[in-house]
Design a protein with these regions (language model features):
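A common structural microfeature
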Residues: 19-21, 43, 59
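Short aromatic-enriched loop/helix-cap "lid" or pocket-rim segments at secondary-structure transitions
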Residues: 33-36, 58-59, 74-76, 82, ...
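Glycine-centered secondary-structure boundary/capping sites
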Residues: 14, 38-43, 65-67
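Segments that shape or occlude catalytic/ligand-binding pockets
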Residues: 29-56
């Protein structure tokens, strides 16, 4: 029987693992009593050394390590309200957190040792585009793409260099992959034109992916929204796994026909059309469909839960139904 780490690598590389790998989260959801990894299994381990650290400065506001001030909404993460890079003249003075410092990973080492059989993912929150608009402001960054192109590219390069240093730190810890986030789509299109994306972001992502591959690590990117216009580009520059919480706005059939067998998908059932409805029959059917259509390439699909189910109104029973369905149908076709 393969170890979890070997199962995941085989799924990503389309080498016919014995079952679909699952990530049913090592973190407990407030209000849920089920220990999902203990009950249903877990093939992954998140290493969180450079992830999202912050300090509350009021009851509803907190500041992250980059100097962004967030406003919370109930129990949700909230959004950035104060952006530290107000003027481009301040770019040279930008506060870069010391995320590659080995000291901040010391508390992760015992857990890494205990999870050598798992596929270990080093987490980097808000890797490139999201980091840029957190620092500059979303609307302002949109204008900057056309009015301050040189400064935008300088900022992108600073973030890429920083990200590569963090990647190397995770490599030294023995991680098998990098997991990062960058939401690129709204419901029906990209947030910027594909042409602009290819000019500014594509070469910088390639440097990031290449850095991971140089250290023998896979790269997993979370991105929500309609992103089919750039999936071919991501595949071309070496993205190994796309983690998407929505599929129905693009179409599972389309994803399978155009991209199946070329990139590995890492998904829960759709959080907008399926999991949110708490319809057990629909959840089971969609879990089966994801495996049958995206995982019919001797791999190419890995199952996961959604990390904030209560934020979308998903019940504990619905999450259990999804996990059980992924286990029930978790063989490649």
């Amino acid at each position: 029987m393969d170890r979890s780490v070997d199962l995941v690598k085989k799924a990503i590389e389309f080498r016919g693992p014995e079952r679909v790998p699952v990530s049913f989260t090592q973190f407990k959801t407030p209000g849920f009593t089920t220990d999902f990894p203990k009950v249903y299994g877990e093939d992954f381990h998140f290493v969180m050394g450079s992830a999202f650290n912050f300090n509350f400065i009021s009851e509803t506001q907190y500041i992250d390590e980059w100097g962004c001030i967030w406003e919370t909404f109930g129990d949700t993460m909230g959004e950035v309200k104060t952006h530290p890079l107000k003027e481009w003249e301040d770019l040279e003075k930008l506060k870069i957190p010391d995320l590659e410092n080995p000291a901040r990973y010391e508390n992760q080492k015992p857990m890494i040792e205990q999870n050598q059989d798992k596929f270990k993912m080093g987490a980097i929150a808000f890797v490139l585009f999201e980091r840029m608009h957190h620092l500059r402001g979303f609307q302002q960054l949109m204008e900057d793409f056309y009015l301050e192109r040189e400064n935008v590219e300088k900022l992108g390069d600073i973030i890429v260099e920083h990200t590569i240093r963090v990647i190397n730190t995770y490599a030294e810890l023995g991680c098998d992959a990098i997991f990062s986030t960058d939401d690129w789509g709204v419901q029906d299109r990209l947030l910027i034109s594909p042409k602009l994306w290819r000019e500014i972001f594509k070469p910088r992502y390639k440097k990031i992916f290449d850095a991971a591959h140089k250290r023998n690590m896979k790269y997993i990117l979370h991105s929500c929204g309609q992103i089919t216009d750039i999936l071919d580009d991501f595949i071309e520059i070496g993205l190994d796994v796309i983690q998407m919480d929505q599929q129905d706005n693009m179409g599972i059939d389309l994803l399978s026909e155009r991209f199946g067998g070329r990139i590995c998908f890492f998904c829960p059932t759709d959080i907008q059309t399926t999991l949110i409805n708490n319809d057990k029959e629909l959840i089971e059917a969609k879990a089966k469909e994801l495996i049958e259509k995206l995982g019919k390439f001797k791999g190419g699909f890995m199952a996961k839960t959604y990390p904030q189910p209560t934020d979308i109104g998903a019940t504990e029973e619905s999450v259990k139904t999804m996990c059980e369905a992924f286990i029930k149908y978790g063989r490649y076709f």
